[in-house]
Amino acid sequence: MKYTSYFLALLLCVLLGFSGSYGQGQFFREIENLKEYFNASNPDVAKGGPLFSEILKNWKDESDKKIIQSQIVSFYFKLFENLKDNQIIQRSMDIIKQDMFQKFLNGSSEKLEDFKKLIQIPVDDLQTQRKAINELIKVMNDLSPKSNLRKRKRSQNLFRGRRAST
């Protein structure tokens, strides 16, 4: 747990960006509170390397980066959920969650609810597994780039048109 907490401050800064606003100062103070609570500045936390920083470096394209960031944000929401009964750090976690919510989900409460639903889905439940497999084709179709499909259809129509005119 200590190892994970060390990177909370570092990665939230990288993940969420920097800003000079008043609220951002409070955000950094709350991260410092969490670092202190988890003793995350202790040198032993660095053993084994960072959790997310090295992975984030590998994702350069902005749209690709969003994919990995969603997994990292999911991790932090799970971490905060596991610590929700800890009154000592509750305020800090609430402020950080709110900032994360604003930056990652653009303040959309509907997106937040959907995101929470997704991270709560138990992968070891047989009924859930069956439903997931049943929806797999639709999910894969949604993942396919629609613009390529349109381009392909357009080029097929052009090719057919040329063929008919010759």
Curated annotation (Swiss-Prot):
One of its GO terms (cellular component) is extracellular space. It comes from the Eukaryota. SUPFAM superfamilies: 4-helical cytokines (SSF47266). GO terms for molecular function: cytokine activity; type II interferon receptor binding. Coiled coil: none annotated. Keywords: Antiviral defense, Cytokine, Glycoprotein, Growth regulation, Pyrrolidone carboxylic acid, Secreted, Signal. GO terms for biological process: adaptive immune response; defense response to virus; humoral immune response; positive regulation of biosynthetic process. Glycans are attached at residues 39, 106. The keyword Hydrolase does not apply. The modification Pyrrolidone carboxylic acid is found at residue 24. Residues 1-23 form the signal peptide. The keyword Signal applies. It is found in: Secreted. Its main location: secreted. Released primarily from activated T lymphocytes. Type II interferon produced by immune cells such as T-cells and NK cells that plays crucial roles in antimicrobial, antiviral, and antitumor responses by activating effector immune cells and enhancing antigen presentation. Primarily signals through the JAK-STAT pathway after interaction with its receptor IFNGR1 to affect gene regulation. Upon IFNG binding, IFNGR1 intracellular domain opens out to allow association of downstream signaling components JAK2, JAK1 and STAT1, leading to STAT1 activation, nuclear translocation and transcription of IFNG-regulated genes. Belongs to the type II (or gamma) interferon family. Homodimer. Interacts with IFNGR1 (via extracellular domain); this interaction promotes IFNGR1 dimerization. This is Interferon gamma. It comes from Bubalus bubalis. The gene is IFNG.
